[in-house]
């Protein structure tokens, strides 16, 4: 079989080698390797290429009818032969991304304890808080460079899934590798089990997590601090990604640690970056700048406020003052428009609250303006949904917006798809085909009035793999706001609509390899400019990015004794 790159020296043999997913090649072990590693007779006699293996695996994959069974099958391959898994995934990325991640990963999280087959990553329980250093040493991977960690409290739009939240770090890191070329040998999913408040899980005899309510806030803060300090001791320079933490913890954790360790929150910053990139592409379709648009958010949690903050950063880069940018952003929560007179606002919400004194000319009947009131009075150009509440974008809301704006930009971003604020077909119908639409979950093309409308998916996979690749390639000490902004700009520049290649806002998923490299280059340049990484010339940076980009190809093995 053709093998690529330099030989890899392996101390394992026999069943131990076959049971090591990072090294197992299955039927692709050559005759010489089978003899050298005591594999003769342990495998069928035929020697196969990875292409032949992938063809068989794809045939088996297609035999499963339901998305969750396809997900289980792909995970089984991943736990047996990671190289084959990533070859299969990259060969069929657009088809399999919704299976390995959203929306199917949501079902996998809900069914985690029922479909559990084998362990992957680390599970760190609160009861083991004094053993974190030992647990990290138990990791099967020794050179970890990227960690995705969750506590399972806010899984997609599904709420508290307890230990089932582990499906998210596993799926997210699969995309770091498939889209960003980060070797699976350098990635580690981590589940912090601090209990669950989901009574259904606590009463489920199959539930595999700790059977107690979530711990108190002071205990939680101390536990997270112990974990982060232990991680940076074990793997200095590791990039730590927070994933699906609930609102009371998500933004405080990010603000507490972002200037201390190399970390970012994909729900806040990754979502913000991909959304801003898609907005920039949509604004180009209109021939406008983002700074010329008024934006309404439905949902004022950490994700919505994170997007709003990134929009403000882009608007100020285009020439507005921070105060001018703030006046063009309207946050709506379940009580109505977020205003400075509201009680109980968190710090990040207060920073985006509209001044009551600026709205004296508005007419509304309730204590605070409703979403429909805001649509009438603000006449926004952009409507973004991050509420997790299906159906909030009603026909009246959309039609009102379309009457005031020639080409409204409407992004119902909540996922999974059953929680989307409005379906794209309805948005186009109610706006009479005028809306530019992107969603958080995957939707197919929409036909309206004899015209086909492509529906972009604001999938964070457009952004975070490239950020990770860039951070690793220059060994950046931090992830900065400017790094996120240039990632957005790079995504917008890759828009087919911006390059005269149709109306699609975002490139096809099959083009993510080059996009990730382009984002990595832009991010790496900013890291150097901001003094977060040692300076290197552009050619060296591109060479590092290419060298760091792992490909799912087999290497020839030579045996070594230890």
From Swiss-Prot:
| Site for Important for activity, residues | 267
Keyword Hydrolase present in the record's keywords: the answer is no
Sites binding NAD(+) sit at: 154, 267, 415
Which is one Pfam family of this protein?
A: Malic_M
Does the keyword field hold Nucleotidyltransferase?
no
> What PROSITE patterns does this protein map onto?
MALIC_ENZYMES
Task: Report which reactions are catalysed by this protein.
Answer: (S)-malate + NAD(+) = pyruvate + CO2 + NADH; oxaloacetate + H(+) = pyruvate + CO2
Active site at: 101, 172
From the record, give the cysteines joined by S-S bonds.
none
Question: Which keywords, in A-to-Z order, does the entry hold?
Answer: Metal-binding, NAD, Oxidoreductase
Please provide, alphabetically and separated by semicolons, the GO molecular function terms listed in this UniProt record: malate dehydrogenase (decarboxylating) (NAD+) activity; metal ion binding; NAD binding; oxaloacetate decarboxylase activity
Enzyme Commission no: 1.1.1.38
PANTHER family cross-referenced by the UniProt entry: MALIC ENZYME-RELATED, NAD-DEPENDENT MALIC ENZYME, MITOCHONDRIAL
In which family does this protein belong, per the annotation? Belongs to the malic enzymes family.
Give the HAMAP family listed for this entry.
NAD_malic_enz (MF_01619)
The protein in question is named NAD-dependent malic enzyme
As recorded in Swiss-Prot or TrEMBL, the protein's gene is named: maeA
């Amino acid at each position: 079989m053709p093998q690529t790159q330099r030989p890899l020296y392996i101390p394992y043999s026999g069943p131990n080698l076959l049971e090591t997913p990072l090294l197992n090649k299955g039927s692709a072990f050559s005759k010489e390797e089978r003899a050298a590693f005591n594999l003769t007779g342990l495998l069928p006699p035929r020697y196969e290429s990875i292409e032949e293996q992938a063809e068989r695996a794809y045939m088996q994959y297609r035999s499963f009818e339901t998305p969750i069974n396809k997900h289980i099958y792909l995970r089984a391959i991943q736990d047996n032969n990671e190289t084959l898994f990533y070859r299969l995934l990259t060969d069929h990325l657009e088809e399999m991304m919704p299976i390995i991640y959203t929306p199917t990963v949501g079902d996998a999280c809900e069914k985690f304890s029922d479909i559990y087959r084998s362990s992957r990553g680390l599970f760190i329980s609160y009861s083991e808080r004094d053993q974190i250093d030992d647990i990290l040493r138990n990791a099967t991977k020794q050179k970890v460079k990227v960690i995705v960690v969750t506590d399972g409290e806010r899984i997609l739009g599904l709420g508290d899934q307890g230990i089932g939240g582990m499906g998210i770090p596993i799926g997210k890191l699969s995309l770091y590798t498939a889209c960003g070329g980060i070797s699976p040998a350098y990635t580690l999913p981590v589940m912090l089990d601090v209990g669950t408040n989901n009574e259904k899980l606590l009463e489920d005899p199959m539930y595999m997590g700790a059977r107690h309510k979530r711990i108190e806030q002071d205990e939680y803060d101390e536990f997270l601090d112990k974990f982060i300090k232990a991680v940076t001791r074990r793997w200095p320079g590791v990039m730590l990604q927070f994933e699906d933490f609930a609102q009371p913890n998500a933004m405080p954790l990010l603000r507490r640690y972002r200037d201390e360790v190399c970390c970012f929150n994909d729900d806040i910053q990754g979502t913000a970056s991909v959304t801003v990139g898609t907005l920039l592409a949509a604004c180009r379709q209109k021939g406008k700048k983002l700074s010329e648009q008024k934006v309404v958010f439905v949902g004022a949690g950490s994700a919505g406020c994170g997007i709003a903050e990134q929009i403000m950063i882009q608007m100020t880069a285009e020439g507005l003052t921070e105060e001018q940018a703030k006046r063009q952003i309207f946050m709506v929560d379940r009580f109505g428009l977020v205003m400075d007179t509201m009680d109980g606002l968190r710090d990040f919400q207060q920073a985006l609250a509209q001044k009551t004194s600026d709205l004296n000319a508005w007419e509304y009947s309730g204590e605070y303006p409703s979403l429909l009131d805001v649509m009438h009075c603000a006449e926004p150009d952009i409507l973004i949904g991050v509420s997790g509440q299906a159906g909030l974008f009603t026909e009246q809301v959309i039609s009102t917006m379309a009457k005031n704006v020639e080409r409204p930009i409407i992004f119902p971003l909540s996922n999974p798809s059953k929680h989307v604020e409005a379906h794209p077909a309805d948005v186009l119908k109610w706006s009479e085909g005028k809306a530019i639409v992107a969603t958080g979950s995957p939707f197919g093309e929409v036909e309206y009035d004899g015209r086909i409308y492509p529906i972009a998916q604001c999938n964070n996979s457009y952004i975070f793999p490239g950020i990770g690749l860039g951070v690793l390639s220059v060994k950046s000490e931090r992830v900065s706001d400017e790094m996120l902004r240039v990632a957005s700009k790079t995504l917008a520049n890759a828009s087919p609509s911006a390059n005269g290649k149709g109306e699609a806002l975002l490139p096809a998923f099959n083009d993510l390899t080059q996009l990730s490299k382009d984002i990595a280059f832009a991010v790496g340049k900013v890291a150097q400019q901001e003094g977060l990484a040692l300076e290197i010339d552009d050619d060296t940076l591109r060479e590092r990015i290419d060298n760091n980009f792992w490909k799912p190809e087999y290497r020839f093995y030579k045996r070594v004794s230890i």
